[in-house]
Amino acid sequence: MWPLCFLLNKLLRVEERNQGILDGNGDSTFPKYCLFDDPLVSDGKYRDAGLPSSSHMDVPHVHQLASWDCGLACVLMVLRASGIASCTLEDLAEICSTNSIWTVDLAYLLQKFCVEFSYYTITFGANPNYSIEEFYKEQLPEDLVRVDLLFRKAHESGIIIQCRSVSIHEISCLLLSGNYIAIALVDQDKLSKSWLEEVLVSGLHSSNSCYTGHYVVICGYDAVRDEFEIRDPASSKIHERISSKCLENARKSFGTDEDLLLINLENMRNQNGY
């Protein structure tokens, strides 16, 4: 078995992230580098790996202004946490020029502002199978071509997309390192009921069980409670905590592709003198 300190060092080698991409069939088209080498973490004993039992990053809360701009609000939270204050939701919306926001759109926004991040998904491109979901039905035919083109142009634009699932343990370890936050695509209907009752934006949550795509920022983890701290752009609460099980169910729901943008916030703050 590898020493735990060696595993931790492998976890934090984000600087080498720009060496890989996978196509939609899982075939490697460029030399691949995987940010995570599945950490051997069990029973929440993070102290043994030199990690604290809890950690959170200071991320200012930003409310979304419409039912479709939660992803833009999450990007704005990342920018403000990085020390980039000269930007608004309206600015980001103008750059995107669409109100059908996909994770790849958020990746291009982060790239435009020189944010260091890693992009993970289990599906390369837009999944046509989502046409059966009410959430995607109206926009998907139009989005298929646009989104697929963004994926195809990602590598030449400097965006590395890794086609793999990221475990909840990997996410918790990176958060406990105190250097990272994440933007995650989740199914809002699978989040806790008590949390959803606090949403500000009307019409965002319904009583049915259909998939409702939503973006949140994950900015902390408590290993003792097994809870993640998040920033929800639709919530009236600035600080939210959610159980590991609830987050896992919400982000692995059919429709999310397990999309995850992992941001090295510490490096960004150092670069911006924040």
Curated annotation (Swiss-Prot):
It catalyses: GTP = 3',5'-cyclic GMP + diphosphate. Its EC number is 4.6.1.2. GO terms for biological process: cGMP biosynthetic process. Its cofactor is Mg(2+). Gene3D superfamilies: Cysteine proteinases (3.90.70.10). It comes from the Eukaryota. Pathway: Nucleotide metabolism. The keyword Lyase applies. Keywords: cGMP biosynthesis, Lyase. It is an enzyme of class 4 (lyase). GO terms for molecular function: guanylate cyclase activity. PANTHER family: GUANYLYL CYCLASE DOMAIN CONTAINING PROTEIN 1 GUCD1, PROTEIN GUCD1. Functions both as monomer and homooligomer. Magnesium-dependent guanylyl cyclase that catalyzes the formation of guanosine 3',5'-cyclic monophosphate (cGMP) from guanosine 5'-triphosphate (GTP). Can also use ATP as substrate with a low activity. This is Guanylyl cyclase 1. It comes from Arabidopsis thaliana (Mouse-ear cress). The gene is GC1.
